Amino acid sequence: MTTANAYKTESDIEAAVVGLYSDMNPYPGDSWLYYGGYMIMITDYATDMGYSTAAGDPTKLSNMTYDASNRYFSNNWRDMYNVISNANTILDNVESIDMSVEKKNLVKGQAKFLRAMAYRDLTDAWGPVPFITSLVKNPFTLNDVPLTPVSEIESVLISDLKECINILPASWSGQDLARATKGAAATLLGKIYLRNHDYTNAKTYIDMVLNSGEYELESDFKYVWSENNKYGKEMIFALLHETGQNAAEIACHFGPSDHPDVPGRWQYYGVSLPFWRSYDKEDPRREFFYYDYTGDSKRDDKSNYGFHYMIPEEGVVDVPNDTTKYMQNVATMKYTYDMISDAYYDGRTICVFRLSDVILCKAEIENNLNGPAAALPYLNQIRGRAGAPEYGKNSRFPVPATKEAMNDAILKERGYELVFEFQRRADLIRFGKYEEIVNAHLKKLGIAQPTNVTSDLRYFPYPLNDAQLNPNLANENPSRLPK
């Protein structure tokens, strides 16, 4: 079977579209690739947000000592291009299928949206990349494919996403609930404009989402993450899974270690203690972590109780007794809240875009176009929903007086609200704070020189295996490595 004869009927092309969604969380024996977990390492982990206790590649990313051989680079690169390749195959074949124009448009809209997602992720991480928009029949031609500037890639993505907005539905239902929509396409388009600080165009598409009437904040921020609310009214685009279909193992990797209520999880991806400590103590989201509990496993053969796991006060190293263990990082509850199944393949929903993110994008846009007063209601909308002290309503949180101060407040809020939702690194870079905040974080941890992160590290090195095949990638890598 080849691409020339595999797509003959409407059911063939529809099966390919379903497969394209599964490519966002591929399952080659482990269901934790790309948005299933690996994506977190090149978004939130290589910042002040993540801290690894695992040896090797995870630690090298969280302490900024990575090199081009890091598996999180090669695997994410491969999986992003797999989405692109399969989307290109669909788009190259759909016109020859005997089906209505309306159905063809739905196929094209979904394929172009998911391809745009993959290219947005690639350009966030690596900047200029090989830009391929049709099926590659001879893979050897890729060995010297040139790097396309980000601006040229974006011009195509912008055109594609505008088309997606026109041809995708406002919503789907039933088993199709998690497919791409107008709102998802508008969100991605708004974010691409925002990445370039094009606030006027970003406002057009962010407002389109906010004014659509399709989305609504949950009254309780925790309920966003409940398994009883798998694709709730706040979700704009998410990857929906079912336990019985060997789908997603995100709870295993993000869940707490040795916890009695969430057994069998690994805490492989943990939030750094300095980041967790930076939450205001009156912010209920601070409590949405597993930071103080008695372990499920007995301490030893003579005890009926587990260790007491807790976070030490800053600067404290020595544990008070032999029944206590200090945690080196802390697990979020987002991917284990209201667990329905203890199965290894947990079936958890993986959020990609949700309304609170878009509202904070609106705050950012209004601040940069019209100043702090215009941004304040949107910032406080998210803090108010969470139950955190609001700016201008609490003496400890005066209204930021300048655009710069308001941007700082919005950036902090994005971190607290969107922790471990694949946002932090792009946010820090967009706000011009990446070097400053990550260097301060590394200095606090004592694991690197305070100048370890420079502007050269805006982009990651191209994966070693690919760079060995393509000199255009190899030539760029020396400047992209931590010194």
Walk through the language-model features, giving the residues of each:
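Elongated scaffold/linker segments in the mid-to-C-terminal portions of large proteins
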Residues: 5, 17, 25-28, 46-79, ...
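Conserved, well-structured interaction surfaces
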Residues: 14, 22-28, 53-126, 148-152, ...
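A short, exposed helix-loop element centered on a Lys and neighboring polar residues
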Residues: 1-36
